From Swiss-Prot:
Its EC number is 6.1.1.7. GO terms for molecular function: alanine-tRNA ligase activity; aminoacyl-tRNA deacylase activity; ATP binding; tRNA binding; zinc ion binding. It catalyses: tRNA(Ala) + L-alanine + ATP = L-alanyl-tRNA(Ala) + AMP + diphosphate. It is an enzyme of class 6 (ligase). This is Alanine--tRNA ligase. Keywords: Aminoacyl-tRNA synthetase, ATP-binding, Cytoplasm, Ligase, Metal-binding, Nucleotide-binding, Protein biosynthesis, RNA-binding, tRNA-binding, Zinc. Zn(2+) binds at H590, H594, C694, H698.
Length: 876
């Protein structure tokens, strides 16, 4: 986008005494009513002059500022919306909500779904982790903040307002609403992009502080687009969207003029932490100057800050070091608020995706607690944050949070202990510790870079910690998205979906609209295409007296493509026949998946979310988020509850609801199985158990499932459990197989079936004892053989050599390591000979090389060579 397009030369500016100028520092265009102003108002072009000199007559709290914003825009016809969760379950391309517009991308911004109001006003809690290292450092950075917005979604048939009204509203809110002198406000022109959209924008500044951004979104991402912004191409879209973002915390800070933003938004919590830590007080005079100076250099430059402050304060370094303790107070409180929002959305800490971000915040919080000697608890800080925000935050799952934090703190403590050993090991083998070492120690062992630096300093080594270390680590875990191109292009034919009209339809007649090779598209079909974890239907088409098998079915746009084992020409009518046994089993397993998920959530807790799923004919699996092992008693409880519901015979209903009507009734749980980009959501509901947006085929009543049996539960990654189960006929087959096995054991053991399990347990126990006894006897025998064996002389040392079976090598290895001796073993392997060397000191490969003059396989403590002929003369 060109720097100057003239698209922001608005009548409002001209009619209200604004002049368009070019900033003498950065060269950007900006608008102001102050004829003497030469700079755009942004830092570092301008300083922070509001600290100690707030331009707002009244000092607002967060809740007061939020209410003032809502009142102003509700009076002007804006519908007030409730905030969305910070974890965007309605989209799959981002981990956290970074801005209010995320709530409406891509379904509303693309024009597919009507907005929930037009225009709207809201305050959206948001979390941004890219500046996590600067929290507490600059006095202005936050991971958690609320973005106030007034948005309008303009289409051809529904135009609300655009640039003129948007700027007027912002100006009137700041001047009439908050009482700010209009001459202090500047509007800086700057293009904006994010979430697949872009447009012209105005950044709004007051006394150096950016308080809002007004985006006029009218472009969408397009690889062939004519406009380029920051390396990405865009093209015009049909919608014109007003996307504004006002920083609630920044407006509150502006009204109070405190040294830092934290003191404006967390005053009572800061006092509480001060009372319960060894930080005595906050040096407000010095801190004010730290903040003022820090904004004058991007990125943050500590050396510049110290140098500048040194000109004013003779003891700048001493005061700066004391101020670092105050940083930890701000970090602790900020992170507690972000964690509160994450836990409200039932995020479980882990090593992947949003769970990783939660874990990072927890570990930084633990570190901050230790640095200031905080006597309170993180859960207490989370609750205090909630008490200040309970008007906009749903009740917290306190027991869940306590459980999760307890587990995380235990893990961190264990990792720290192991990590110390890892650091010492690295320091023994390396002369320096690089960034990759720091990332490994942090990611895998939870060791903060400053701990590594302290340990390295004791060894006389200096560790360079990147100032953006945590942001750099986070970038390795962020979800990446890219425009996907279909590998194959099909004609835009809309296939009518008969499987939705009647999921029990087994036969149909359709017209072949497209045929190429072994692929056909019909005008209508009862064959279900693969999707939502449900495999495609199989069956056949009847054509000219022949059966042509349907091997696969896929959906491409509105067309449903059938892959065949033969060819059918275009323009003919064919009869389609569904493989009903396969379809019915898939319907049972698909419906059973919904039932299982609902019961798991009911018994394990609301933190259970679907993480993955695969339905199949013989068995299915469901992956869920959960942070504790699921024991046998809980499995039985789950199965019994499912059986009760099946016996009750709960009906299964399917409804196509408008997007926001569906969300209003069922919440964002709807999107556990995926997010449809369509104006309506197909909601599959098991009465009183589960409701989910789903495109699959289902039973009319869960009684048709018959029975469900969990086969196994396994942790497939941290805090993700896979539940493999069978339902219907496959469950019956499992019971039959299990009974047959028990019957066979009963016959072999001459015991009743109800005693067969005890018999097997006792037999296994006895066999294990016999094996241990044999192993002990064999160990003693081999020890005696080693003692009596001939030795082979290699250089200055003699090494015992014995003949042994390959199955005895593990025993020999245990003996060698326990006694600290080296041993050579000769074993017969078919017609060949294997020579194994065992060396606790790590010289096994060298021993074999000296002995046989060839390279060995294995490791330095146990290696071997296989040769064609007997090479040694070993006598027992």
């Amino acid at each position: 986008m060109e720097k100057q397009t003239g698209e922001l030369d608005l009548k409002f500016f001209k009619n209200n005494g604004f002049e368009k100028k070019i900033c003498r520092v950065c060269g950007s265009y900006f608008w102001t009513t102050d004829s003497r102003r030469e700079t755009c108002g942004d830092t570092p072009c301008d300083e922070y002059t509001f600290i100690g000199n707030p331009p707002v007559p009244k000092k607002y709290t967060l809740s007061e500022m939020r209410k003032a914003f809502f009142d102003f825009f509700e009076k002007r016809g804006h519908k007030l919306l409730e905030p969305y969760p910070v974890v965007p379950r309605w989209r799959e391309d981002v981990l956290l909500v970074n801005a209010s517009i995320y709530d409406f991308q891509p379904h509303v911004t693309s024009g597919i779904v009507k907005p929930p109001g037009n225009p709207i006003v809201m305050s959206q809690p948001s979390i941004r982790m890219n500046d996590v290292d600067l929290v507490g450092v600059t006095g202005r950075h936050l991971t958690s903040f609320e973005m106030l917005c007034h948005d309008a979604f303009n289409s051809k048939n529904d135009f609300v307002y655009w640039k003129e009204e948007t700027v007027r509203y912002s100006y009137e809110f700041l001047t009439d609403g908050l009482g700010i002198d209009g001459s202090l406000i500047t509007y800086k022109e700057k293009p904006w992009s994010g979430g697949g959209n872009a447009g012209n924008a105005l950044e709004v500044f007051v006394r150096g502080l950016e308080v809002a951004t007004l985006v006029f979104m009218d472009m969408k991402e397009d690889q062939e687009g004519e406009v380029e912004i920051e390396g990405t191409r865009y093209t015009k879209m049909d919608m014109q969207i007003v996307d504004t973002g006002y920083g609630l915390e920044r407006l509150t800070w502006l009204s109070q003029g405190t040294p830092t933003v934290y003191q404006a938004i967390y005053p009572e919590i800061i006092d509480y932490v001060l009372e319960n830590s060894y930080v005595e007080s906050i040096d407000n005079e010095f801190l004010s100057d730290v903040v003022r100076v820090s904004v004058m250099r991007e990125p943050y430059d500590e050396a510049f800050v110290l140098s500048t402050l040194g000109e004013k304060y003779p003891n700048a370094l001493e005061r700066f070091e004391k101020a670092k303790k105050v940083r930890d107070i701000f970090v602790l409180i900020d992170h507690a608020r972000s964690l509160m929002h994450m836990f409200e959305a039932f995020v479980i800490p882990s090593n992947v995706k949003v769970g990783y971000l939660a874990r990072l915040l927890i570990r930084r919080s633990i570190r901050a607690q230790k640095n200031i000697g905080f006597k309170g608890s993180l859960i207490n800080l989370i609750e205090r944050n909630y008490n200040e925000l309970k008007d906009i935050v749903k009740p917290l799952p306190i027991e869940f949070i306590k459980d999760v934090l307890s587990i995380e703190m235990q893990k961190y403590s264990e990792l720290e202990k192991r990590g110390q050993q890892v650091i010492e090991k690295i320091l023994k083998t390396k002369k320096s510790i690089d960034i990759d070492d720091l990332v490994l120690l942090y990611d895998s062992h939870g060791i903060s870079p400053d701990v590594v630096a302290a340990m390295a300093a004791e060894k006389g080594l200096k560790v360079m910690i990147p100032p953006n270390f945590h942001a750099m680590v986070i970038s390795r875990h962020e979800k990446k998205s890219a425009l996907k191109k279909s590998a194959k292009v099909y004609p835009n034919i809309e296939t009518r979906t008969l499987y939705y009209d009647d999921s029990t339809m087994r036969e149909f007649t359709g017209l072949v609209m497209y045929s190429k090779g072994n692929e056909v598209i019909l005008d209508k079909t009862a064959f279900y295409p693969e999707g939502g974890g449900q495999p495609a239907d199989h069956g056949y088409f009847e054509f000219k007296g022949k059966k042509i098998n349907v091997l696969d079915v896929q959906k491409h746009g509105n067309a449903i493509v059938h892959k065949l084992d033969g060819e059918i020409p275009e323009g003919v009518r064919v009869k389609g026949v569904i493989d009903w046994e396969r379809r019915s089993r898939l319907m049972v397993h698909h419906t059973a998946t919904h039932l299982l998920l609902g019961v798991l959530r009911d018994i394990l807790g609301d933190h259970v979310w679907q993480s993955g799923v695969q339905k199949d004919v013989s068995e299915s699996h469901l992956d869920i988020t959960h942070y504790k092992r699921i024991d046998e008693d809980t499995i039985k409880k789950i199965e019994h509850r499912i059986f009760e519901l099946i016996t009750e015979g709960r009906p299964v209903s399917v409804k196509n609801l408008d997007w926001y009507m569906a969300i209003g009734k069922y919440g964002f749980r709807l999107f556990e199985g995926g997010v449809p980009l369509s104006p309506k959501v197909r909601v599959v509901e098991i009465e009183g158990v589960d409701a989910e947006g789903c495109g699959g085929t289902h039973l009319k009543n869960i009684s048709s499932i018959g029975v469900l049996k969990i086969k196994k539960i396994e942790a497939i990654q941290e805090n993700i459990y896979r539940i493999t189960f069978v339902a219907g006929v496959p469950a019956l087959e499992l019971f039959e197989d299990s009974y047959d096995l028990a019957y066979r054991v009963s016959n072999i053991s001459k015991k009743n079936i109800d005693q067969a399990g005890d018999f097997v347990e006792n037999t296994v126990r006895e066999l294990s004892k016999i094996k241990r006894d044999l192993d002990s006897a064999r160990t003693k025998l081999i020890e005696e053989e080693i003692r009596k064996s001939n030795s082979i002389k290699l250089g200055e040392k003699e090494i015992p050599a014995i003949e042994a079976e390959t199955s005895d090598i593990d025993i020999v290895s245990r003996i060698a390591h326990s006694k600290g001796i080296e041993v050579i073993i000769e074993s017969r392997v078919g017609t060949k000979f294997r020579y194994t060397a065992i060396s606790p000191s790590g010289k096994s490969k060298q021993i074999l090389h000296d002995l046989l003059h060839t390279d060995a396989e294995g490791n330095d403590k146990l290696s071997y060579v296989i040769v064609d002929h007997k090479e040694l003369s070993i006598t027992r």
